């Protein structure tokens, strides 16, 4: 689900000590899931969704940051989630204020061939 209301974003920023960036975002996506049955599978699936969403946002020049949700009861109240659902992660989105988000043109790193081994070490 997507939150864009400034008051709601400010409230959501308090569900975890590292979620302060949510308050200043243009929008925040709440990844909502069924109350976990298989937590490892859920964490994997939501992790994949999170990284793909963040990569797609970067490709569009949109900055993003993720946050955990520590206070589930508070998040459920803020988002008005039905029984059996919980908010797993928050992903804040927005355009950088100081500069356009651009990929590194000349990354300062070793060549791919120097760090990847093929078939054996």
Describe the predicted segments one by one.
Residues 29, 37-78:
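Small-aliphatic-rich amphipathic alpha-helix that forms the alpha element of a beta-alpha
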Residues 79-91:
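Short, electropositive alpha-helical surface patch
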Residues 90-121:
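C-terminal helix-cap and adjacent tail motif
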Residues 37-40, 88-89, 101:
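A short, structure-level motif marking secondary-structure boundaries and short turns
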Residues 21, 59, 82-83:
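Arginine/glycine-rich "motif VI" loop of SF2 helicases in the C-terminal RecA-like domain
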Residues 32, 68, 93:
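Conserved residues at the C-terminal ends of beta-strands
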Residues 1-46:
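Glycine/small-residue-rich phosphate/adenosyl-binding loop
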Residues 77-82, 103-106:
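Short proline/glycine-enriched turn/loop segments at secondary-structure junctions
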């Amino acid at each position: 689900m997507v939150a864009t209301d400034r008051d709601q974003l400010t409230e959501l920023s308090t569900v975890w000590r590292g979620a302060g960036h949510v308050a200043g975002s243009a929008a925040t996506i709440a990844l909502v899931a069924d109350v976990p049955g298989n937590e490892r599978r859920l964490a994997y699936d939501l992790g994949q969704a999170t990284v793909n969403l963040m990569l797609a946002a970067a490709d569009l020049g949109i900055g993003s940051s993720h946050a955990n949700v520590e206070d589930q009861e508070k998040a459920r109240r803020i988002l008005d989630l039905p029984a059996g659902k919980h908010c797993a992660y928050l992903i804040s989105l927005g355009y950088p204020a100081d500069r356009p988000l651009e990929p590194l043109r000349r990354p300062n790193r070793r060549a791919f061939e120097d760090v990847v081994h093929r078939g054996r070490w």
